[in-house]
């Protein structure tokens, strides 16, 4: 036996060092037992029993067993008899009278020894009367005392405490129940009321261990049930529900035990770093991040099950505790359903098993009746039972298919039905593909939610487009969506857009094929099915084009318009795209992205209306911009001759890639800029295209792009777009679109300081060198292979390079410095950050002003990979 029972410890063994060794030996033993797949329940309870014996032996050693009316009591989780390797050990030293100074000093020595053993001790020294007084005023103390368990000492003193705790005046069960429900709501709100968080807390996240504890606390206070098993004996849990809760608790315990093995100090957060190790400890393996994603999928599914049971059982408790079993009067809806208060309930005990399609009727009623807010607990229980006994998915039933399409077409279903259908497992029971994505996560910083939660949020965002109050945030979608005749096609595309994830291959292709089959199976016409399938297949097309292509290039617009083909598709696609971005990550949507998508939408709309066979005449566009800008400049008092002399220095590209207002703004300051040897730096006072435009005019110099972006990076500013242009006489006319750390335009009170800093580094004239910097904690555990690809382009003069890497500090400046090192000219850049990944696009030429040859491309690829590795060695 690798460790000794503490009860047999002799006095020479009761030293700090000896006890530390014993504890370490026991912990190592349990660790090995865990790796040998020993039941985690035995380990958790066994650790508590070991601690009981140790404390009992030390209590004896200090001579406390001779004290009268003093007890050592376990409270909280330890009181339940549950200890994980790093759990707090909550102790109460209980007495009938205040302790004498001598005894108090001895108790202090006892506690000091426990701390010296590096045990996480939480303690209180109180009389029974003090416990009663503090417990009445503090819900947390009252809850901990409920789970009090005598370890050693005076039984009579402990009995007096139990009498106080169990008295109705201590915490009346109705008040205790309401307080615990309120506490749970507040806790859930801290986690955004979702079971899906990137780095979840095993205890406190919705559906976590605390939700199981809440059920136990309420049942113990009102019904006297001291365990989940006793709750089933009292009839508040069915045998199946009891087994399910125990199974969920067991899984969460295994995750927590594995986490505590990995940690050195107490924590219940499953951070990215620890997800990697916990997945290995639990036996989840796979290529890349597959093992982590499999483990987290089971974790999130477990949270969903606990959350569902918690919600149902609290409703049952609500009726039993607050209403004394009394019910509101039933209002008949039809033969199958009735409304009682704000809840819908089935009128027949086996309705869903006899006619499963009526499950969908229930949600149709919820969509149609604004007074119905939720499902009655008995009906939830019936639904759970029927769901488990289904021998085939609901979509195979013709009657269910009719009702599902009716739901999709219902104007209130988006906000009244689909979220509830998901929470109650009905979407998973309807569609096998949906069942596969429940709990499916992606191990990255970009996708904040699991695939199913993201899809439900996408539906909610589509609903927001019907509300005129959201026009400022979503101007295009709020104008388009109300006019869309067949909104059900957009909703079906939303349901299927990510449904192919987690199965290997292109999820857009997989989802498109399955969406088409689903539409045909559900009686939609072939053209309708084709439109839904096209939307699913191309749901990323618009965001990728807007964020990673040069949308001011007429060829890019024509290429995009050819893929879209008509305005109807464009309108559906922009609504799906905006909702998709908003539902992926709350921080993704900002005025910059809104402006990009708007420009792409309107440019494409104009191209489609003009006809794809009639592309924009570049010379006509340049002429138009010059005429409009010239008119604005003449209003400022400049002569046509002054304007003409300045413009003769510019290449045609300048007038093509800027609006007439930008041209007028630049040139107003250039014509007033007296000393051309000094740099001119301008910042737009109003948000331009959703960000701040930084315009730089200066003599061309080596590594200018790298110098500018390094300085912007130092000021915590992010470059999202860059137009790099040279005049005919050796000056640069560079434009950077910049956002602050919050994705907003730079505040005006920062403008002058930023201008001074940029002028200083430009006058200094020396390329800025980037030193390796510490990778932020949230990036340290991600591996992103640096990729450099050269994309096909119609241009015979320029190279289009796509660059992917871990988004480490100084990355963009390092890329710019590499271009300068190889004597390459940068003409444009599109900078996109997707979670931990930088996915950037650069337009380049070589020293001769032509596109790179294969040898130059390979040299550039090697240098970029080398320099990025130096910047972030652990990222590769």
Swiss-Prot record:
Superkingdom of this protein's organism: Bacteria
Keywords in alphabetical order: Hydrolase, Magnesium, Multifunctional enzyme, Nucleotidyltransferase, Repeat, Transferase
EC id: 2.7.7.59, 3.1.4.-
Database matches in InterPro entries: ACT-like_dom_sf (IPR045865), ACT_dom (IPR002912), HD/PDEase_dom (IPR003607), HD_domain (IPR006674), NT_sf (IPR043519), PII_UdlTrfase/GS_AdlTrfase (IPR013546), Polymerase_NTP_transf_dom (IPR002934), UTase/UR (IPR010043)
NCBIfam families to which the protein is assigned, alphabetical: PRK01759.1 (NF002487), PRK05007.1 (NF003448), UTase_glnD (TIGR01693)
Pfam families tied to this protein: GlnD_UR_UTase, HD, NTP_transf_2
First and last residue of the signal peptide: none
Free-text comment about domains: Has four distinct domains: an N-terminal nucleotidyltransferase (NT) domain responsible for UTase activity, a central HD domain that encodes UR activity, and two C-terminal ACT domains that seem to have a role in glutamine sensing.
Keyword Amino-acid biosynthesis among UniProt keywords: no
GO biological process terms, semicolon-separated: regulation of nitrogen utilization
Catalytic activity: [protein-PII]-L-tyrosine + UTP = [protein-PII]-uridylyl-L-tyrosine + diphosphate; [protein-PII]-uridylyl-L-tyrosine + H2O = [protein-PII]-L-tyrosine + UMP + H(+)
Uridylyltransferase: region residues: 1-332
Activity regulation statement: Uridylyltransferase (UTase) activity is inhibited by glutamine, while glutamine activates uridylyl-removing (UR) activity.
Cofactor: Mg(2+)
Family stated for the protein in its record: Belongs to the GlnD family.
UniProt-recorded Gene Ontology molecular function terms: [protein-PII] uridylyltransferase activity; phosphoric diester hydrolase activity
UniProt protein name: Bifunctional uridylyltransferase/uridylyl-removing enzyme
Naturally occurring in which organism (per UniProt): Vibrio cholerae serotype O1 (strain ATCC 39315 / El Tor Inaba N16961)
UniProt-annotated stretches for the region Uridylyl-removing: 333-692
Encoding gene per record: glnD
Domain named HD: residues: 451-573
Record function comment: Modifies, by uridylylation and deuridylylation, the PII regulatory proteins (GlnB and homologs), in response to the nitrogen status of the cell that GlnD senses through the glutamine level. Under low glutamine levels, catalyzes the conversion of the PII proteins and UTP to PII-UMP and PPi, while under higher glutamine levels, GlnD hydrolyzes PII-UMP to PII and UMP (deuridylylation). Thus, controls uridylylation state and activity of the PII proteins, and plays an important role in the regulation of nitrogen assimilation and metabolism.
